[in-house]
Amino acid sequence: MKTLIHILLGTLLFAGSCSDEMPVCTPAVHGPRHVTFTFSCDALPGTRAVADESRVEDINLYLFPANDAPARHVYAASQRTVALELPDGRYTLYAVANLGTDTGPLPEAEVRALRSAWNPDGSDSGTLPMSAMRTFTVRGTTQIAIELVRAVAKVDFSYTVAADFSRSLSVRSVRLCNVPRFAALFGEGRITADGECAATEAFPADDDGYSAVYYLPENLSLIHI
């Protein structure tokens, strides 16, 4: 009986001495995740174009974490794919294409206020300003497709002179007025001063008719010159 008691006490002492050696469970900590962003822009309907309407020459990418961690900015030239390492979490993304320059790190309010300078007679670079904004969540390796939206509208303009008016109406030139000099990328295209609007050059025209393609920024305030 004494032998049995000694065995039981020895077992308890051994178990107690081993309890301090048991590993403590800790939550898993994940490192940064591999996130790939792919940018595209659908072709516009119609066959006529005076700019490469879907071309992406450069991208300014801004990422703002929901937990107020430091924002990320990446400038990518001549590529439609950007790969980053990001911690798990929720983000707000802003992308701007075809500005032709690295806009650098900016606060979110300044990103939302970005505008693209616009020549009323058309794009100087042959490309169109584009942008995108969305939220996304990272929980592992992630691939995100970003659809860019053009910041200007395509207008197919044409006219003909009806036969009844051909003797009394003579057309010499055509020009568009009140064209904004800037295209809003995220906010409303609201012009606030006359100097922010201009007219296109006058294009020779005649009574036989005229047709052209224009790309026009938004003008909500109807400022005119």
Predicted feature locations:
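Conserved "repeat-terminator" motif of extracellular CCP/Sushi domains
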Residues: 145-152, 213-219
